[in-house]
Amino acid sequence: MPWSSRGALLRDLVLGVLGTAAFLLDLGTDLWAAVQYALGGRYLWAALVLALLGLASVALQLFSWLWLRADPAGLHGSQPPRRCLALLHLLQLGYLYRCVQELRQGLLVWQQEEPSEFDLAYADFLALDISMLRLFETFLETAPQLTLVLAIMLQSGRAEYYQWVGICTSFLGISWALLDYHRALRTCLPSKPLLGLGSSVIYFLWNLLLLWPRVLAVALFSALFPSYVALHFLGLWLVLLLWVWLQGTDFMPDPSSEWLYRVTVATILYFSWFNVAEGRTRGRAIIHFAFLLSDSILLVATWVTHSSWLPSGIPLQLWLPVGCGCFFLGLALRLVYYHWLHPSCCWKPDPDQVDGARSLLSPEGYQLPQNRRMTHLAQKFFPKAKDEAASPVKG
């Protein structure tokens, strides 16, 4: 195997280790914060942290279990019996099991001098599922936790060291999850264009810079009006859920479980853009962007008209220039990325494809695993080229 290929396998393995470590670090930070709140007598804050953790974990395990059940029989080879897997997910360990499975397969492939096509394809299959689950966990748990911690800090006027650790890990974790998801989608393209260093930095930064004003707007509103933030979230979330439903998503294996996906996507859309349907992607992205921007402006107007000071005595005017600066810089980087660095490709129909595996056989005569869930999303995320061949690799 060429050194470049072995280097790519090692890079994927290292990124897998870092992703798993980041998940455990984020989990530990949240539990640490909950314990500190409880020890300080702030039981409501501790309960909110644990509730967000619990709800996100249950959703994550449901996704993982439903996907395992939908995968073709024999795809995962030697794995624990279904009852053991069900117990792992019931104990909220299904995601970690998948992480261990991915790392083990990645290490196996890297150690082989000439890994088989099946082993390489199976490693990609596992990594794609992990990337999607990580994205779900990020917006179901990390983004709400970040908003909660910021609201607590702004309301109390003081920041503990564990809160600063949580804020830093949350912002980096969210941006990294979006970058990893985008990188994973690129592996589903026919030409498999890699996300270069420059493209990665720009994609990471514009997500971070656009996320900060949104989280700050909601956190400041929560600090000023803690009794109304749940109503605000529910109202917007229902509108976004209706929008997702109208787009006719078909990501999950059956119609009943599709609602779990729609509920999750609506939560993601509350914080950031997420494409779920083919067609006028740019138009839908602009509509969503204008919707979130209008909502954030309304939140800012609410601060200004009701109070110019936070309960902690911090003037709100200090935060507005920071949020505006991040917003315009993030918007500029986003335009740069989508104008010059976003790839397009030609998707050729594959009517003979069965769920979870390519219909074409490898030279050895067995089917190569293909993660159709992520391939389906990639077909929606990336524009189609006008010519018959994939466009030149960008970034």
UniProtKB/Swiss-Prot annotation:
<dbReference type="Pfam" id="PF09815">
    <property type="entry name" value="XK-related"/>
</dbReference>
<comment type="subunit">
    <text>Interacts with BSG and NPTN; which act as chaperones to localize XKR8 at the cell membrane.</text>
</comment>
<dbReference type="GO" id="GO:0005886">
    <property type="term" value="C:plasma membrane"/>
</dbReference>
<feature type="topological domain" description="Cytoplasmic">
    <location>
        <begin position="222"/>
        <end position="223"/>
    </location>
</feature>
<keyword id="KW-0812">Transmembrane</keyword>
<dbReference type="GO" id="GO:0017128">
    <property type="term" value="F:phospholipid scramblase activity"/>
</dbReference>
<dbReference type="GO" id="GO:0048471">
    <property type="term" value="C:perinuclear region of cytoplasm"/>
</dbReference>
<feature type="transmembrane region" description="Helical">
    <location>
        <begin position="260"/>
        <end position="277"/>
    </location>
</feature>
<feature type="transmembrane region" description="Helical">
    <location>
        <begin position="159"/>
        <end position="179"/>
    </location>
</feature>
<dbReference type="GO" id="GO:0051649">
    <property type="term" value="P:establishment of localization in cell"/>
</dbReference>
<keyword id="KW-0053">Apoptosis</keyword>
<feature type="topological domain" description="Extracellular">
    <location>
        <begin position="34"/>
        <end position="47"/>
    </location>
</feature>
<feature type="transmembrane region" description="Helical">
    <location>
        <begin position="48"/>
        <end position="68"/>
    </location>
</feature>
<feature type="transmembrane region" description="Helical">
    <location>
        <begin position="285"/>
        <end position="305"/>
    </location>
</feature>
<dbReference type="GO" id="GO:0002513">
    <property type="term" value="P:tolerance induction to self antigen"/>
</dbReference>
<comment type="function">
    <text>(Microbial infection) Incorporated into Ebola virus-like particles, where its phospholipid scramblase activity is required to promote phosphatidylserine exposure on the surface of viral particles. Externalization of phosphatidylserine on the surface of viral particles is required for uptake by host cells.</text>
</comment>
<feature type="transmembrane region" description="Helical">
    <location>
        <begin position="13"/>
        <end position="33"/>
    </location>
</feature>
<dbReference type="InterPro" id="IPR050895">
    <property type="entry name" value="XK-related_scramblase"/>
</dbReference>
<feature type="topological domain" description="Cytoplasmic">
    <location>
        <begin position="1"/>
        <end position="12"/>
    </location>
</feature>
<feature type="topological domain" description="Extracellular">
    <location>
        <begin position="306"/>
        <end position="312"/>
    </location>
</feature>
<keyword id="KW-0963">Cytoplasm</keyword>
<keyword id="KW-1003">Cell membrane</keyword>
<dbReference type="GO" id="GO:1902742">
    <property type="term" value="P:apoptotic process involved in development"/>
</dbReference>
<feature type="topological domain" description="Extracellular">
    <location>
        <begin position="245"/>
        <end position="259"/>
    </location>
</feature>
<feature type="topological domain" description="Extracellular">
    <location>
        <begin position="180"/>
        <end position="200"/>
    </location>
</feature>
<dbReference type="GO" id="GO:0070782">
    <property type="term" value="P:phosphatidylserine exposure on apoptotic cell surface"/>
</dbReference>
<feature type="modified residue" description="Phosphoserine">
    <location>
        <position position="362"/>
    </location>
</feature>
<dbReference type="InterPro" id="IPR018629">
    <property type="entry name" value="XK-rel"/>
</dbReference>
<dbReference type="GO" id="GO:0045663">
    <property type="term" value="P:positive regulation of myoblast differentiation"/>
</dbReference>
<feature type="site" description="Cleavage; by caspase-3">
    <location>
        <begin position="355"/>
        <end position="356"/>
    </location>
</feature>
<keyword id="KW-1133">Transmembrane helix</keyword>
<feature type="transmembrane region" description="Helical">
    <location>
        <begin position="224"/>
        <end position="244"/>
    </location>
</feature>
<feature type="topological domain" description="Cytoplasmic">
    <location>
        <begin position="69"/>
        <end position="158"/>
    </location>
</feature>
<feature type="topological domain" description="Cytoplasmic">
    <location>
        <begin position="278"/>
        <end position="284"/>
    </location>
</feature>
<dbReference type="GO" id="GO:0097350">
    <property type="term" value="P:neutrophil clearance"/>
</dbReference>
<feature type="topological domain" description="Cytoplasmic">
    <location>
        <begin position="334"/>
        <end position="395"/>
    </location>
</feature>
<feature type="modified residue" description="Phosphothreonine">
    <location>
        <position position="375"/>
    </location>
</feature>
<keyword id="KW-0597">Phosphoprotein</keyword>
<feature type="transmembrane region" description="Helical">
    <location>
        <begin position="313"/>
        <end position="333"/>
    </location>
</feature>
<dbReference type="GO" id="GO:0043652">
    <property type="term" value="P:engulfment of apoptotic cell"/>
</dbReference>
<protein>
    <recommendedName>
        <fullName>XK-related protein 8</fullName>
    </recommendedName>
</protein>
<keyword id="KW-0472">Membrane</keyword>
